[in-house]
A protein has these predicted regions:
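An alpha-helical appendage that flanks or caps ligand/catalytic pockets
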Residues: 127-191, 224-231, 235-358
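Hydrophobic faces of well-ordered beta-strands that scaffold small-molecule active sites
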Residues: 26-28, 71-77, 100-106, 194-199, ...
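Hydrophobic, small-residue-rich alpha-helical packing segments that form membrane-like cores
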Residues: 3, 7, 16, 60-195, ...
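Short, acidic/polar
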Residues: 5-17, 198-208, 346-360
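N-terminal beta1-alpha1-beta2 module of alpha/beta enzyme domains
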Residues: 1-67, 191-194
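Acidic-and-aromatic substrate-binding clefts and catalytic sites of carbohydrate-active enzymes
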Residues: 51-53, 80-85, 223-228, 343
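Catalytic cores of nucleotide-enabled group-transfer and carboxylate-activating enzymes in metabolic
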Residues: 34, 53-56, 63-76, 198, ...
Length: 364
């Protein structure tokens, strides 16, 4: 029923369902551009509804918060095209309205279509986007944590004082990318700083996660690869002055299960029948910057050096080192699961494999 995404009742009912099911949180992905690399057009994305049309996730959260008490809400926001002064207020507002149940999934954006529609001639380079992100978060930390003392708001009716001015401080930030001299617009929220999530497997992305994130999304192909990535991020966290257990690592897995292995495989095959191969290539075009329509469907793809999600092509190669990946292979093996592995089997098969990911891969 995802087509009902534009109706508030859809989100309210979903929140109630997740609360009843004891889910910890609802994570909402988002992009501010379109997938228009494939065939040089947005046409395929529109036909397949590849993250378009899409609404702003910030507006769903307050309604869901009113019908839940425990469910958390992870909201994606691409900071490359935001201003920290304004975005800090948005998250403070959500933190107030949810009573401290909001998280920010920090992304730097990777779609050139977003860049050109938001005033740039082309996408900012990969590493510079992370440089911007580092300073952006430094500014928001100052706004959230340093601008208002905990007891700044008095609400003193007798004296006619709502806020004690001596306890509200300009942050005086002057940096390479941002100048923010003033005070935060919002009084302290329950968390002040929302829980920070981040997803990025490049060397620069891992360093950013190690410095800032409390939750890190990764998408390795195997538990062994997960161990390498999780150990590296935790080691980097220690180098950044944090402890190894100061962040939690989550991996992308798609689980398809039924009463038996055979029934689960049948369900998987049925799901494949609903997948759209061109839609998958449209996604991969946006993720990698490669127009796969220019390649013969059976032509092996060599690693291509481009400036968009560098880890994606490496992931294809490591997912099956004996396969020379072709566009047809992407359609066949990635139409379900996207960038992550797919676990297909009965309850025991799936549970055993999930335990292996935790034990071998170091996943939380």
């Amino acid at each position: 029923q995802a087509w009902k995404y534009k109706d508030l009742d859809y989100w309210v009912d979903l929140a109630k369902l997740l609360e009843r099911g004891y889910f910890d949180s609802l994570f909402i992905a988002d992009v501010v551009g379109v997938y228009d690399v494939y065939r040089g057009s947005v046409e395929t994305s529109l036909i397949d509804a590849d993250q378009v049309p899409v609404n702003d996730p910030f507006f769903q959260v307050p309604a869901m918060a009113t019908v839940t008490k425990h469910l958390g809400f992870g909201v994606t926001s691409a900071l490359t095209y935001e201003q920290p002064y304004a975005l800090a207020r948005k998250f403070s507002t959500l933190d107030h309205l949810t009573k401290g149940r909001v998280a920010w999934n920090v992304v730097t954006s990777y779609l050139n279509s977003a860049a050109v529609n938001l005033g740039l001639k082309q996408q900012i380079s990969h590493d510079e986007r992370y440089d911007i992100a580092d300073e952006f978060l430094d500014v928001t930390y100052k706004l959230w944590e340093g601008s208002w003392d905990e007891d700044a708001v008095l609400r003193d009716r007798e004296k006619g004082i709502f806020t004690d001015p001596s306890k509200v401080h300009p942050i005086g930030h002057k940096g390479k990318y941002f100048d923010v001299p003033g005070i935060h617009l919002s009084e302290p929220s329950p968390q002040r700083t929302p829980v920070i999530f981040q997803a990025g497997a490049s060397t620069r992305g891992r360093a950013f996660a190690a410095k800032h994130a409390e939750g890190v999304f990764i998408s390795p192909a195997t538990p062994e690869q997960a161990r390498e990535v999780s150990d590296d991020i935790r080691n980097r966290a220690v180098e950044a002055g944090r402890t190894r257990d100061s962040l939690k690592i989550f991996t992308l897995l798609t689980v398809i299960t039924a009463e038996s292995d055979e029934a689960a495989q049948a369900k998987y095959q049925e799901y494949l029948g609903y997948s759209n191969g061109e839609g998958m290539l449209s996604f991969y075009g946006g993720w990698t910057g490669i127009d796969f329509s220019e390649y013969d469907p059976d032509q092996p793809l060599e690693a291509i050096d481009n400036d968009s999600i560098r880890s994606v092509l490496e992931l294809l190669a490591t997912a099956d080192p004996h396969r020379k990946w072709t566009p047809r292979d992407i359609i066949k093996h990635r139409s379900i699961g996207g960038l992550g592995p797919v676990l297909v089997g009965g309850p025991k098969t799936v549970a055993d494999e999930l335990e292996r990911w935790v034990d071998v891969g170091g996943i939380d």
